[in-house]
């Protein structure tokens, strides 16, 4: 039986503040896996790194496809290559090999354009460095052939991605649990 508690539930807050030992060990492993890919980034590049990860986590593959670590690496690499090429004065859009990676790359490019449209100044070089770090992290996670979504799971845990129902899905009613 599952109880649907709101985010403000005091019991959930206590569980987040004092996680179980297994959860704490997993968090330590996750941070240890991510640090090598971001240790060379500046603060601004780290912000872009996590911004692109939020785009990756929000991305919904179409139809029967699913997003894999390889797709994340291809998409990040292609967008980074496009930005690096533009920095040299050549307009050429690099394209990832897989269709899910192409769609993710399109979403990443759209997010970058949207942020720039709001007036935020983002240099192509900074964004490319952050994307190359994502590509390296996804490539490193692919070394474990048993799990082809290890990097996505890692990022989801670190960003505390909570599954939100889609707009067309039915929302379950809240729990009838009464707290004093």
Each language-model region and where it sits:
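C-terminal, charged low-complexity interaction regions
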Residues: 83-180
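Generic structural motif recognizing short loop/turn segments at the entrances and edges of beta-strands
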Residues: 3, 45-46, 173
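N-terminal cysteine/histidine-rich coordination modules
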Residues: 1-25
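Generic preference for hydrophobic/aromatic residues in regular secondary structure cores
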Residues: 9, 51-53, 80, 134, ...
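Charged, low-complexity interaction segments
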Residues: 21-111
